[in-house]
């Protein structure tokens, strides 16, 4: 009898342990389900965001991977004439980042809009109404440099030296003599720089320190009026 009683007690304890394990498993399952539910909500939000971004990009006149629709509106207000459309003619992420890549895609093209994103996330660029060509200087009375952080436009002050095309061994193009320069292999080195010279005061302050920067991505659009 005593043995039987002990066995019954052991079985009851085992049963209690099993119940506790089952309860713990159920709690874990509930936690997993809750986490899955949260993940599903996050995925849904991300999908909606992507949809909105795609819609925004489709609505943009400037089909850029760098700027959003609000930033596009700012730039459009600066461009001298009302444009009908734009065409992406050069993108370092697709076409390469050398002088020859730029020359192949942009030689003779005008007017153009340059948009740059640095490795630190700064976004700026420039507008050129004259055609890109070898060397320079290239005269342009309508060119300007712009920044989106802070939001500011810098007009050309020396139109006869507004632009410089591909020249020497390492310069892809320049706005002004040294105001805004993009170098050969621009995404692989920090030989790109902003100094300020032939455009309105303040350009130099866009890049802190010595003015040099790495390009994360550079886009050039041909503008159609």
Annotate the PLM regions.
Residues 2-225:
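Phosphate-recognition beta-domain surfaces
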């Amino acid at each position: 009898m005593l043995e039987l009683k002990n066995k019954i007690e052991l079985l009851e304890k085992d049963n209690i342990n099993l119940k506790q394990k089952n309860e713990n498993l159920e709690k874990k399952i509930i936690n997993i389900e809750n986490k899955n539910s949260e993940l599903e909500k996050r995925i849904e939000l991300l999908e909606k965001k992507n949809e909105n971004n795609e819609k925004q990009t489709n609505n943009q006149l400037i089909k850029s991977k760098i700027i959003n629709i609000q930033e596009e509106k700012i730039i459009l207000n600066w461009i001298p004439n009302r444009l009908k459309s734009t065409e992406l003619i050069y993108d370092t992420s697709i076409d390469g980042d050398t002088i020859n890549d730029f020359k192949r895609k942009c030689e003779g093209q005008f007017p153009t809009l340059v948009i740059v994103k640095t490795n630190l996330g700064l976004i700026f660029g420039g507008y050129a109404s004259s055609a890109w060509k070898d060397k320079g200087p290239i005269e342009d009375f309508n060119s300007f440099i712009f920044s989106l952080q802070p939001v500011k436009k810098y007009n050309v002050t020396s139109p006869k030296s507004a632009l410089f095309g591909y020249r020497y061994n390492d310069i892809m193009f320049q706005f002004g003599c040294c105001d805004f320069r993009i170098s050969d292999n621009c995404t692989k080195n920090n030989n790109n720089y902003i100094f300020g010279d032939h455009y309105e005061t303040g350009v130099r302050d866009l890049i802190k320190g010595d003015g040099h920067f790495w390009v994360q991505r550079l886009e050039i659009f041909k503008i159609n009026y």
